[in-house]
Amino acid sequence: PKLFFEELDFEKYADFTINFPLLFIEHEGAYVSGKKYIFKDFMDGKIREIGNRLPNEKDLTTHLSTIFTENRLKKYIELRSMDACGWECLCSGPAFNTGILYGNLDEAYDLISKWDKNKIINAYLEAPKKGFNTNLMGKDLYHWTSVLLEISKKGLKSRDVIGKGGYNETHYLNHLEKIIDNKLTNADHMI
């Protein structure tokens, strides 16, 4: 949503969520369509189909789970990851984020702190068309991904979590490394 390209704070996020259309409401063990309403209508007791009852915490949690933004605020911060891809790809996204978030955040911050907000937004909007060839701050996304991938890898190595197969989490990044090395995304393979 355009809102997320502006200066966002918690109040704006809360306003966005309560004014977001309801997908459905759970009521007395059944799902009721919420298509005609926004969550604020629910808060104001204006939904006759459910006896004008007010929402509870579970209703809010359900509503938040139907809003598909890049990040969602729940009892934790949920980052949208890669989807519509194979197993290796599905595991790469969370591993990448884990390595960044649990690694050297200062190194990642130093890298991105000088980036221009409008150029980031422009790259975000261009990426669906241009993929990794999208320009950001004078370099393509292949470059930035490879730099961030190295930061992530260092973070996973320092966590040193060993799985059942005896590997640490860095092996989940193999899929992303292959994409960067070959400069071929899943979309490139399909075309």
Label the model's feature ranges.
Residues 1-191:
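C-terminal accessory/tail domains of diverse enzymes
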